[in-house]
């Protein structure tokens, strides 16, 4: 995160655990959840970054969900890098949750079926994503040598550039980060044009 701050990045999303990962055996999942809770607590205690949980918190164990909410509350007044902490996150789930939220909001307001149909568009759905109000990512760095998105920020990454790195996350070095930034800087972003 310090590396991101050094070059002026304002929003970072760290994907720590997918919704698919929640199906892992308890003996694998529980230690991961404790590491995530400790990591989020450590990030919040620094009071250096704004912690923003991203994911289906209702699918997480209570202790993990509470750790994420507490980190968000602890850093609410911090002025600095926004760190989206994606835990219990799946891109498809996010889009479904956004559409449900949008429909519930307009149903509660008494909107007709025709009115509901007219507001199902890119802008209105984006306003209900977990990352609402944030810019879409310019660059997505995927560690571990895997060359797939695995459902990461499906909606938001429509025009993102991707960089795949062989290093696993714990071994990801500053030189790896700078290579990704350099590769991104050399690209000609066309946004579909």
Predicted regions and their residues:
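Flexible, compositionally biased loop and terminal segments
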Residues: 1-193
């Amino acid at each position: 995160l310090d590396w991101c701050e050094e070059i002026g990045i304002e929003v970072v999303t760290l994907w720590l655990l997918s919704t698919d990962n929640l199906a892992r055996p308890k003996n694998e999942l529980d230690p991961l959840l404790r590491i995530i809770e400790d990591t989020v607590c450590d990030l919040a205690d620094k009071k250096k970054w704004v912690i923003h949980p991203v994911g289906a918190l209702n699918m997480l164990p209570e202790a993990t969900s509470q750790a994420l909410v507490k980190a968000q509350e602890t850093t609410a007044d911090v002025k600095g890098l926004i760190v989206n902490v994606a835990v219990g996150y799946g891109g498809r789930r996010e889009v479904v949750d956004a559409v449900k939220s949008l429909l519930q909001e307009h149903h509660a307001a008494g909107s007709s079926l025709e009115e509901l149909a007219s507001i199902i568009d890119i802008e209105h759905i984006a306003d209900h994503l977990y990352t609402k109000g944030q810019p879409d990512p310019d660059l997505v760095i995927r560690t571990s040598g895997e060359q797939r998105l695995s459902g990461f920020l499906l909606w938001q990454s429509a025009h993102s550039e991707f960089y795949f790195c062989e290093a696993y996350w714990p071994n990801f070095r500053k030189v790896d980060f700078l290579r990704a930034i350099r590769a991104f800087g050399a690209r000609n972003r066309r946004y579909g044009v």
